[in-house]
């Protein structure tokens, strides 16, 4: 499964909002430095979709706020 994700680093609280178009807006506490925000994003998405962190990959947008995430789910 692939999801478009818009990341908002340096937020006061962590939360995930699903948009009407199916994309996600993810608010992260971590700053976008040294991959910390990406690590936090993967942890949050793994918890939300109930998968291992290793099942989530950032396909594009590694250094951008707009990302394409791939989630491997065994359903």
Curated annotation (Swiss-Prot):
Gene3D superfamilies: YggU-like (3.30.1200.10). GO terms for cellular component: cytoplasm. Residues 1-23 are annotated as: Disordered. HAMAP family: UPF0235 (MF_00634). Belongs to the UPF0235 family. This is UPF0235 protein Npun_R3528. The lineage of its organism: Bacteria, Bacillati, Cyanobacteriota, Cyanophyceae, Nostocales.
